[in-house]
From Swiss-Prot:
Organism: Pseudomonas putida (strain ATCC 47054 / DSM 6125 / CFBP 8728 / NCIMB 11950 / KT2440)
Protein name (database record): Trigger factor
Pfam families: FKBP_C, Trigger_C, Trigger_N
EC number per UniProt: 5.2.1.8
Annotated localization: Cytoplasm
PPIase FKBP-type domain: residues covered: 161-246
Notes concerning its domains: Consists of 3 domains; the N-terminus binds the ribosome, the middle domain has PPIase activity, while the C-terminus has intrinsic chaperone activity on its own.
Entry GO CC: cytoplasm
Amino acid sequence: MQVSVENTSALERRMTIAVPAERVENEVNKRLQQTAKRAKIAGFRPGKVPMTVIRQRFEADARQEAFGDLVQASFYEAIVEQKLNPAGAPAVEPKSFEKGKDLEFVAIFEVFPEFTVAGLESIKVERLSAEVADSDLDNMLEVLRKQNTRFEAVERAAQNDDQVNIDFVGKVDGEAFAGGSAKGTLLVLGSGRMIPGFEEGLVGAKAGEERVVNVTFPEDYQNLDLAGKAAEFTITVNSVSAPVLPELNEEFFAQFGIKESTLEGFRAEVRKNMERELRQAIKTKVKNQVMDGLLAANPIEVPKALLENEVNRLRVQAVQQFGGNIKPEQLPVELFEEQAKRRVVLGLIVAEVVKQFELKPDDAKVREMIEEMASAYQEPEQVIAWYYKNDQQLNEVRSVVLEEQVVDTVLQKATVTDKSVSYEEAVKPAEAPAAAE
Protein backbone atom coordinates (compact mmCIF):
# COMPACT_ATOMS: atom_id res chain seq x y z
CA MET A 1 0.00 0.00 0.00
CA GLN A 2 1.33 3.41 -0.96
CA VAL A 3 0.62 6.45 1.21
CA SER A 4 1.54 10.10 0.75
CA VAL A 5 0.54 12.97 3.05
CA GLU A 6 0.31 16.66 2.23
CA ASN A 7 -0.08 19.34 4.92
CA THR A 8 -2.67 21.71 3.43
CA SER A 9 -2.91 23.85 6.59
CA ALA A 10 -1.74 23.78 10.20
CA LEU A 11 -4.18 21.00 11.03
CA GLU A 12 -5.58 19.75 7.70
CA ARG A 13 -4.00 16.76 5.99
CA ARG A 14 -4.55 15.49 2.44
CA MET A 15 -3.66 11.82 2.34
CA THR A 16 -3.45 9.87 -0.93
CA ILE A 17 -3.73 6.11 -0.55
CA ALA A 18 -3.20 3.43 -3.22
CA VAL A 19 -4.33 -0.10 -2.40
CA PRO A 20 -2.73 -2.80 -4.64
CA ALA A 21 -5.04 -4.27 -7.28
CA GLU A 22 -4.31 -7.78 -6.01
CA ARG A 23 -5.72 -6.92 -2.55
CA VAL A 24 -8.76 -5.30 -4.15
CA GLU A 25 -9.52 -8.35 -6.32
CA ASN A 26 -9.03 -10.68 -3.34
CA GLU A 27 -11.66 -8.70 -1.40
CA VAL A 28 -14.05 -8.71 -4.36
CA ASN A 29 -13.59 -12.47 -4.89
CA LYS A 30 -14.11 -13.14 -1.19
CA ARG A 31 -17.49 -11.41 -1.32
CA LEU A 32 -18.49 -13.19 -4.54
CA GLN A 33 -17.65 -16.56 -2.98
CA GLN A 34 -19.82 -15.72 0.04
CA THR A 35 -22.63 -14.67 -2.29
CA ALA A 36 -22.32 -17.91 -4.29
CA LYS A 37 -23.04 -19.97 -1.16
CA ARG A 38 -26.40 -18.35 -0.53
CA ALA A 39 -27.52 -17.10 -3.97
CA LYS A 40 -30.83 -18.50 -5.24
CA ILE A 41 -31.07 -18.38 -9.02
CA ALA A 42 -33.68 -20.17 -11.10
CA GLY A 43 -32.30 -23.26 -12.83
CA PHE A 44 -29.49 -23.83 -10.33
CA ARG A 45 -29.31 -25.63 -7.00
CA PRO A 46 -28.28 -23.49 -3.99
CA GLY A 47 -24.50 -23.30 -3.82
CA LYS A 48 -24.08 -24.71 -7.35
CA VAL A 49 -24.40 -21.49 -9.35
CA PRO A 50 -21.38 -21.09 -11.71
CA MET A 51 -19.03 -18.28 -10.72
CA THR A 52 -19.41 -16.73 -14.18
CA VAL A 53 -23.12 -16.26 -13.47
CA ILE A 54 -22.40 -14.95 -9.97
CA ARG A 55 -19.97 -12.41 -11.44
CA GLN A 56 -22.45 -11.26 -14.05
CA ARG A 57 -25.14 -10.66 -11.46
CA PHE A 58 -23.29 -9.56 -8.33
CA GLU A 59 -19.80 -8.30 -9.18
CA ALA A 60 -20.80 -4.62 -9.28
CA ASP A 61 -22.32 -4.82 -5.80
CA ALA A 62 -19.40 -6.85 -4.45
CA ARG A 63 -16.92 -4.35 -5.87
CA GLN A 64 -18.81 -1.41 -4.32
CA GLU A 65 -18.95 -3.16 -0.95
CA ALA A 66 -15.24 -3.97 -1.15
CA PHE A 67 -14.51 -0.33 -1.99
CA GLY A 68 -16.22 0.89 1.19
CA ASP A 69 -14.53 -1.67 3.41
CA LEU A 70 -11.08 -1.16 1.85
CA VAL A 71 -11.29 2.62 2.16
CA GLN A 72 -12.10 2.30 5.84
CA ALA A 73 -9.47 -0.37 6.55
CA SER A 74 -6.66 1.20 4.51
CA PHE A 75 -7.34 4.66 5.98
CA TYR A 76 -6.95 3.26 9.49
CA GLU A 77 -3.76 1.42 8.49
CA ALA A 78 -2.38 4.59 6.91
CA ILE A 79 -2.95 6.87 9.92
CA VAL A 80 -1.32 4.29 12.18
CA GLU A 81 1.63 4.04 9.79
CA GLN A 82 1.94 7.84 9.51
CA LYS A 83 1.31 8.33 13.27
CA LEU A 84 -1.54 10.76 12.66
CA ASN A 85 -4.40 11.47 15.08
CA PRO A 86 -7.54 12.52 13.15
CA ALA A 87 -9.90 14.95 14.87
CA GLY A 88 -12.88 13.79 12.83
CA ALA A 89 -14.07 11.57 10.00
CA PRO A 90 -12.29 12.11 6.66
CA ALA A 91 -13.83 13.42 3.47
CA VAL A 92 -13.08 10.75 0.84
CA GLU A 93 -12.49 11.53 -2.84
CA PRO A 94 -12.20 8.42 -5.09
CA LYS A 95 -9.51 8.71 -7.78
CA SER A 96 -9.37 5.25 -9.34
CA PHE A 97 -11.44 2.12 -8.82
CA GLU A 98 -11.17 0.30 -12.12
CA LYS A 99 -11.08 -3.46 -12.32
CA GLY A 100 -7.54 -4.79 -12.39
CA LYS A 101 -6.02 -1.51 -11.21
CA ASP A 102 -4.98 -0.17 -7.83
CA LEU A 103 -7.71 1.38 -5.70
CA GLU A 104 -6.68 5.00 -5.24
CA PHE A 105 -8.44 7.64 -3.16
CA VAL A 106 -7.78 10.86 -1.27
CA ALA A 107 -8.77 11.34 2.37
CA ILE A 108 -8.94 14.91 3.67
CA PHE A 109 -9.13 15.34 7.44
CA GLU A 110 -7.95 17.41 10.38
CA VAL A 111 -5.58 16.25 13.08
CA PHE A 112 -5.42 17.17 16.74
CA PRO A 113 -2.91 19.95 17.42
CA GLU A 114 0.40 18.80 18.85
CA PHE A 115 1.69 21.00 21.65
CA THR A 116 3.23 20.99 25.09
CA VAL A 117 1.48 22.92 27.84
CA ALA A 118 3.64 25.91 28.74
CA GLY A 119 3.56 29.11 30.74
CA LEU A 120 2.28 27.65 34.00
CA GLU A 121 4.66 29.87 35.97
CA SER A 122 3.16 32.97 34.33
CA ILE A 123 -0.35 32.23 35.59
CA LYS A 124 -1.51 34.44 38.46
CA VAL A 125 -4.31 33.34 40.77
CA GLU A 126 -6.05 35.20 43.58
CA ARG A 127 -7.35 32.65 46.09
CA LEU A 128 -10.13 33.96 48.31
CA SER A 129 -10.78 32.91 51.88
CA ALA A 130 -13.90 33.72 53.89
CA GLU A 131 -16.05 32.55 56.78
CA VAL A 132 -19.78 32.43 57.38
CA ALA A 133 -20.29 35.13 60.02
CA ASP A 134 -23.37 35.26 62.27
CA SER A 135 -24.55 38.30 60.31
CA ASP A 136 -24.30 36.29 57.06
CA LEU A 137 -26.38 33.55 58.65
CA ASP A 138 -28.97 36.09 59.84
CA ASN A 139 -29.20 37.54 56.32
CA MET A 140 -29.68 34.07 54.85
CA LEU A 141 -32.51 33.31 57.27
CA GLU A 142 -34.23 36.52 56.16
CA VAL A 143 -33.79 35.50 52.52
CA LEU A 144 -35.38 32.12 53.27
CA ARG A 145 -38.28 33.81 55.05
CA LYS A 146 -38.85 36.20 52.13
CA GLN A 147 -38.78 33.31 49.68
CA ASN A 148 -41.70 31.83 51.63
CA THR A 149 -43.68 35.04 51.97
CA ARG A 150 -47.47 34.77 51.95
CA PHE A 151 -49.82 37.68 51.27
CA GLU A 152 -52.87 38.81 53.21
CA ALA A 153 -55.49 41.22 51.87
CA VAL A 154 -55.40 44.73 53.38
CA GLU A 155 -57.67 47.75 53.09
CA ARG A 156 -55.08 50.43 52.45
CA ALA A 157 -53.13 52.00 49.61
CA ALA A 158 -50.61 49.76 47.85
CA GLN A 159 -46.92 50.21 48.58
CA ASN A 160 -43.70 48.56 47.45
CA ASP A 161 -43.48 44.85 48.34
CA ASP A 162 -47.28 44.56 48.34
CA GLN A 163 -48.95 42.15 45.95
CA VAL A 164 -51.73 43.55 43.79
CA ASN A 165 -54.29 41.67 41.73
CA ILE A 166 -54.89 43.68 38.55
CA ASP A 167 -56.67 43.77 35.20
CA PHE A 168 -55.02 45.89 32.53
CA VAL A 169 -55.34 46.94 28.90
CA GLY A 170 -52.36 48.44 27.08
CA LYS A 171 -52.53 50.62 23.98
CA VAL A 172 -49.96 52.09 21.59
CA ASP A 173 -51.16 55.01 19.48
CA GLY A 174 -54.66 54.32 20.78
CA GLU A 175 -54.67 50.71 19.55
CA ALA A 176 -54.55 47.61 21.78
CA PHE A 177 -51.59 45.32 21.01
CA ALA A 178 -50.98 41.59 21.31
CA GLY A 179 -49.94 40.57 24.82
CA GLY A 180 -50.84 43.98 26.24
CA SER A 181 -53.96 42.92 28.14
CA ALA A 182 -54.61 40.54 31.04
CA LYS A 183 -57.02 39.85 33.88
CA GLY A 184 -56.32 38.71 37.43
CA THR A 185 -52.57 39.21 37.17
CA LEU A 186 -50.68 39.00 40.47
CA LEU A 187 -47.84 41.51 40.71
CA VAL A 188 -45.47 42.36 43.56
CA LEU A 189 -44.75 46.08 43.42
CA GLY A 190 -41.04 46.85 43.21
CA SER A 191 -40.19 43.43 41.78
CA GLY A 192 -39.17 44.92 38.43
CA ARG A 193 -41.24 42.33 36.61
CA MET A 194 -43.00 44.90 34.41
CA ILE A 195 -41.49 47.61 32.20
CA PRO A 196 -40.21 50.77 33.97
CA GLY A 197 -43.01 53.02 35.23
CA PHE A 198 -45.75 50.36 35.32
CA GLU A 199 -45.27 49.24 38.93
CA GLU A 200 -44.41 52.74 40.12
CA GLY A 201 -47.74 53.93 38.73
CA LEU A 202 -49.63 51.61 41.08
CA VAL A 203 -48.01 52.73 44.34
CA GLY A 204 -50.73 54.42 46.41
CA ALA A 205 -53.62 52.76 44.57
CA LYS A 206 -56.43 51.05 46.50
CA ALA A 207 -58.65 48.07 45.72
CA GLY A 208 -61.37 49.06 43.26
CA GLU A 209 -59.38 51.99 41.89
CA GLU A 210 -58.66 52.46 38.19
CA ARG A 211 -55.48 54.15 37.06
CA VAL A 212 -54.04 55.21 33.72
CA VAL A 213 -50.27 54.75 33.58
CA ASN A 214 -48.11 56.08 30.75
CA VAL A 215 -44.85 54.26 30.05
CA THR A 216 -42.25 53.88 27.31
CA PHE A 217 -41.01 50.48 26.22
CA PRO A 218 -37.19 50.14 26.51
CA GLU A 219 -35.20 50.49 23.29
CA ASP A 220 -33.90 46.93 23.77
CA TYR A 221 -37.35 45.43 24.44
CA GLN A 222 -37.61 41.87 23.09
CA ASN A 223 -40.66 42.71 20.95
CA LEU A 224 -39.10 44.94 18.29
CA ASP A 225 -42.54 46.24 17.24
CA LEU A 226 -42.91 47.83 20.69
CA ALA A 227 -39.29 48.79 21.43
CA GLY A 228 -38.94 52.50 22.20
CA LYS A 229 -42.66 53.22 21.81
CA ALA A 230 -44.91 55.10 24.27
CA ALA A 231 -47.83 53.12 25.69
CA GLU A 232 -50.86 53.80 27.87
CA PHE A 233 -52.12 51.19 30.32
CA THR A 234 -55.56 51.36 31.91
CA ILE A 235 -55.23 49.35 35.13
CA THR A 236 -57.92 48.21 37.54
CA VAL A 237 -56.74 47.19 41.01
CA ASN A 238 -58.84 44.25 42.23
CA SER A 239 -57.10 43.76 45.56
CA VAL A 240 -54.07 44.77 47.62
CA SER A 241 -52.25 42.24 49.82
CA ALA A 242 -49.43 42.87 52.27
CA PRO A 243 -46.48 40.49 52.68
CA VAL A 244 -46.38 38.35 55.82
CA LEU A 245 -43.08 36.66 56.65
CA PRO A 246 -43.29 33.18 58.20
CA GLU A 247 -42.20 32.62 61.78
CA LEU A 248 -38.99 30.69 62.39
CA ASN A 249 -40.71 27.68 63.88
CA GLU A 250 -40.86 23.91 63.47
CA GLU A 251 -43.38 24.17 60.61
CA PHE A 252 -41.04 26.51 58.72
CA PHE A 253 -38.00 24.29 59.33
CA ALA A 254 -39.88 21.26 57.97
CA GLN A 255 -40.33 22.98 54.59
CA PHE A 256 -36.58 22.56 54.02
CA GLY A 257 -36.55 18.89 54.95
CA ILE A 258 -34.71 19.65 58.18
CA LYS A 259 -35.77 17.53 61.14
CA GLU A 260 -34.39 19.95 63.72
CA SER A 261 -37.19 21.48 65.78
CA THR A 262 -35.13 24.24 67.39
CA LEU A 263 -33.88 27.51 65.96
CA GLU A 264 -30.33 26.63 67.01
CA GLY A 265 -30.49 23.34 65.13
CA PHE A 266 -31.95 25.01 62.03
CA ARG A 267 -29.26 27.69 62.09
CA ALA A 268 -26.60 24.98 62.32
CA GLU A 269 -28.01 23.18 59.25
CA VAL A 270 -28.25 26.40 57.25
CA ARG A 271 -24.70 27.33 58.24
CA LYS A 272 -23.50 23.92 57.07
CA ASN A 273 -25.13 24.48 53.66
CA MET A 274 -23.69 28.00 53.41
CA GLU A 275 -20.20 26.71 54.20
CA ARG A 276 -20.55 24.04 51.51
CA GLU A 277 -21.65 26.67 48.98
CA LEU A 278 -18.79 28.93 50.08
CA ARG A 279 -16.20 26.20 49.50
CA GLN A 280 -17.64 25.50 46.07
CA ALA A 281 -17.73 29.20 45.13
CA ILE A 282 -14.09 29.70 46.11
CA LYS A 283 -13.08 26.54 44.28
CA THR A 284 -14.96 27.65 41.13
CA LYS A 285 -13.31 31.09 41.11
CA VAL A 286 -9.85 29.56 41.47
CA LYS A 287 -10.62 27.08 38.69
CA ASN A 288 -11.84 29.84 36.34
CA GLN A 289 -8.64 31.82 36.90
CA VAL A 290 -6.51 28.73 36.24
CA MET A 291 -8.42 27.94 33.05
CA ASP A 292 -8.19 31.56 31.87
CA GLY A 293 -4.44 31.42 32.54
CA LEU A 294 -4.03 28.18 30.60
CA LEU A 295 -5.92 29.68 27.66
CA ALA A 296 -3.80 32.83 27.64
CA ALA A 297 -0.52 30.91 27.90
CA ASN A 298 -1.38 28.25 25.32
CA PRO A 299 -3.00 29.66 22.18
CA ILE A 300 -3.73 26.70 19.92
CA GLU A 301 -5.63 26.21 16.69
CA VAL A 302 -8.88 24.31 16.97
CA PRO A 303 -9.90 21.56 14.52
CA LYS A 304 -13.05 22.72 12.72
CA ALA A 305 -14.63 19.30 13.20
CA LEU A 306 -14.37 19.54 16.98
CA LEU A 307 -15.72 23.08 16.97
CA GLU A 308 -18.70 22.10 14.80
CA ASN A 309 -19.47 19.12 17.04
CA GLU A 310 -19.39 21.29 20.17
CA VAL A 311 -21.57 23.99 18.59
CA ASN A 312 -24.13 21.32 17.65
CA ARG A 313 -24.02 19.90 21.17
CA LEU A 314 -24.66 23.35 22.65
CA ARG A 315 -27.53 23.89 20.21
CA VAL A 316 -29.19 20.67 21.36
CA GLN A 317 -28.66 21.67 25.01
CA ALA A 318 -30.25 25.06 24.38
CA VAL A 319 -33.34 23.52 22.79
CA GLN A 320 -33.68 21.01 25.64
CA GLN A 321 -33.32 23.77 28.22
CA PHE A 322 -35.62 26.38 26.72
CA GLY A 323 -38.02 24.15 24.80
CA GLY A 324 -40.17 25.50 22.02
CA ASN A 325 -40.74 24.15 18.54
CA ILE A 326 -37.39 25.29 17.18
CA LYS A 327 -34.92 22.72 15.84
CA PRO A 328 -31.26 22.84 17.00
CA GLU A 329 -29.98 23.53 13.47
CA GLN A 330 -32.20 26.63 13.29
CA LEU A 331 -30.23 28.35 16.07
CA PRO A 332 -27.49 30.66 14.71
CA VAL A 333 -23.98 29.23 14.94
CA GLU A 334 -22.69 32.63 16.09
CA LEU A 335 -24.58 32.28 19.38
CA PHE A 336 -22.42 29.34 20.42
CA GLU A 337 -19.07 29.74 18.65
CA GLU A 338 -17.27 31.59 21.45
CA GLN A 339 -18.39 29.21 24.18
CA ALA A 340 -17.75 26.18 21.97
CA LYS A 341 -14.21 27.31 21.15
CA ARG A 342 -13.40 27.91 24.82
CA ARG A 343 -14.66 24.44 25.73
CA VAL A 344 -12.79 22.71 22.92
CA VAL A 345 -9.50 24.52 23.56
CA LEU A 346 -9.70 23.93 27.30
CA GLY A 347 -10.56 20.28 26.70
CA LEU A 348 -7.40 19.87 24.59
CA ILE A 349 -5.22 21.76 27.08
CA VAL A 350 -6.58 19.90 30.12
CA ALA A 351 -6.07 16.56 28.34
CA GLU A 352 -2.48 17.54 27.59
CA VAL A 353 -1.85 18.51 31.24
CA VAL A 354 -3.21 15.11 32.30
CA LYS A 355 -0.89 13.40 29.81
CA GLN A 356 2.13 15.59 30.52
CA PHE A 357 1.95 15.17 34.30
CA GLU A 358 0.63 11.58 34.17
CA LEU A 359 -2.44 12.37 36.28
CA LYS A 360 -5.07 9.82 37.27
CA PRO A 361 -8.26 10.32 39.32
CA ASP A 362 -7.49 9.98 43.02
CA ASP A 363 -9.95 7.44 44.47
CA ALA A 364 -9.84 9.10 47.90
CA LYS A 365 -10.79 12.45 46.36
CA VAL A 366 -13.56 10.79 44.36
CA ARG A 367 -14.98 9.39 47.60
CA GLU A 368 -14.60 12.77 49.31
CA MET A 369 -16.49 14.55 46.52
CA ILE A 370 -19.32 12.02 46.54
CA GLU A 371 -19.63 12.34 50.33
CA GLU A 372 -19.69 16.14 50.02
CA MET A 373 -22.54 15.99 47.49
CA ALA A 374 -24.39 13.34 49.49
CA SER A 375 -24.28 15.46 52.65
CA ALA A 376 -26.92 17.76 51.11
CA TYR A 377 -29.46 14.90 51.20
CA GLN A 378 -31.44 13.39 54.06
CA GLU A 379 -30.06 9.87 53.44
CA PRO A 380 -26.40 10.46 52.45
CA GLU A 381 -25.42 6.79 52.68
CA GLN A 382 -28.03 5.87 50.08
CA VAL A 383 -26.74 8.59 47.76
CA ILE A 384 -23.16 7.36 48.15
CA ALA A 385 -24.21 3.78 47.38
CA TRP A 386 -26.15 4.99 44.33
CA TYR A 387 -23.06 6.68 42.86
CA TYR A 388 -20.93 3.57 43.29
CA LYS A 389 -23.59 1.41 41.61
CA ASN A 390 -23.86 3.70 38.56
CA ASP A 391 -20.74 3.62 36.39
CA GLN A 392 -21.80 6.59 34.28
CA GLN A 393 -22.39 8.83 37.31
CA LEU A 394 -19.20 7.60 38.97
CA ASN A 395 -17.16 8.33 35.84
CA GLU A 396 -18.59 11.85 35.73
CA VAL A 397 -17.36 12.42 39.28
CA ARG A 398 -13.98 10.94 38.38
CA SER A 399 -13.74 13.40 35.46
CA VAL A 400 -14.50 16.34 37.77
CA VAL A 401 -11.90 15.11 40.27
CA LEU A 402 -9.32 14.73 37.50
CA GLU A 403 -10.02 18.30 36.41
CA GLU A 404 -9.52 19.47 40.00
CA GLN A 405 -6.19 17.64 40.05
CA VAL A 406 -5.25 19.57 36.90
CA VAL A 407 -6.07 22.80 38.76
CA ASP A 408 -3.98 21.68 41.76
CA THR A 409 -1.07 20.85 39.44
CA VAL A 410 -1.19 24.31 37.88
CA LEU A 411 -1.47 26.00 41.29
CA GLN A 412 1.79 24.35 42.36
CA LYS A 413 3.59 26.26 39.60
CA ALA A 414 1.46 29.42 39.35
CA THR A 415 1.82 32.59 41.41
CA VAL A 416 -0.92 32.41 44.05
CA THR A 417 -1.92 35.24 46.39
CA ASP A 418 -4.39 34.71 49.22
CA LYS A 419 -7.02 37.32 50.01
CA SER A 420 -9.51 37.41 52.90
CA VAL A 421 -12.95 38.67 51.91
CA SER A 422 -16.50 38.68 53.23
CA TYR A 423 -18.88 35.80 52.63
CA GLU A 424 -20.95 37.95 50.25
CA GLU A 425 -17.92 38.82 48.12
CA ALA A 426 -16.71 35.23 48.04
CA VAL A 427 -20.02 33.79 46.82
CA LYS A 428 -20.77 36.62 44.41
CA PRO A 429 -20.92 35.20 40.86
CA ALA A 430 -17.66 35.63 38.98
CA GLU A 431 -17.45 37.63 35.78
CA ALA A 432 -17.92 35.77 32.53
CA PRO A 433 -14.83 33.65 31.71
CA ALA A 434 -12.44 34.82 29.04
CA ALA A 435 -12.95 33.60 25.50
CA ALA A 436 -10.36 31.55 23.65
CA GLU A 437 -8.36 33.57 21.13
